[in-house]
Amino acid sequence: MSEPDVKSHKIEFPCDDYPIKVIGDTVVGFKDMVIEVLSKHAKVDLSTLAERQSKEGKYTTVQLHIVAESENQLHDINSALRATGIVKMVL
């Protein structure tokens, strides 16, 4: 029996249009904090910025695209966002 042809979904770096979704507590300045942290680590495309609140308003989601240079860079971004204490998830 042959194995199915499964294609790997690896990221090829640099990736000029890498989507980032950041979910965190709804607090004043959340969007600006996300942009500030991302801007320290990558070129941010603000034209792709989208912000949404959960139905009850407890959480906010900020989505945008960055230029991703490496896996290490993505790890650093994740760590920096999580270190804020208000970010719950980075996708």
Curated annotation (Swiss-Prot):
**Species of the source:** Pseudomonas putida (strain ATCC 47054 / DSM 6125 / CFBP 8728 / NCIMB 11950 / KT2440)
The entry assigns this protein to a family as follows: Belongs to the UPF0250 family.
Concerning InterPro entries, the annotation shows: UPF0250_YbeD-like, YbeD-like_sf
Under which name does UniProt file this protein?
Answer: UPF0250 protein PP_4802
* Gene3D superfamilies per record: 3.30.70.260
| Disulphide bond pairs | none
Q: Which PANTHER family match?
A: UPF0250 PROTEIN YBED
- Name a single GO cellular component: cytosol
